[in-house]
Amino acid sequence: MATGTPAAELRELTEEELVSRLRESKEELFNLRFQMATGQLDNNRRLRVVRHEIARIYTVMRERELGLATGPAGKGDAA
């Protein structure tokens, strides 16, 4: 899969799911960099896609922190 997750899809996730996605993406980026260093990386574009996905996750988290966007509908609005 050479495409990242759209921001709209990330905005539907809860905070815990975003943190989990972030951890997974960072792990993948680490592994891709390791493969690149050892000359085993076949798809260089995947590095860029994963970096952009990490940036999207951070952006969604920051939007919520600043109050520019809310979490998924129905979660936390009732309290």
From Swiss-Prot:
Q: Which GO cellular component does the record give, naming just one?
A: cytosolic large ribosomal subunit
Q: Does the keyword Isomerase apply?
A: no
Which intervals of the chain form a coiled coil?
none
Q: What is the lineage of its organism?
A: Bacteria, Bacillati, Actinomycetota, Actinomycetes, Mycobacteriales
Q: Which GO terms describe its biological process?
A: translation
Q: Which GO terms describe its molecular function?
A: structural constituent of ribosome
Keywords assigned by UniProt?
A: Ribonucleoprotein, Ribosomal protein
Would you tell me the protein name for this molecule?
A: Large ribosomal subunit protein uL29
Family named by the database record: Belongs to the universal ribosomal protein uL29 family.
What's the superkingdom here?
Bacteria
Does Chloroplast appear among the keywords? no
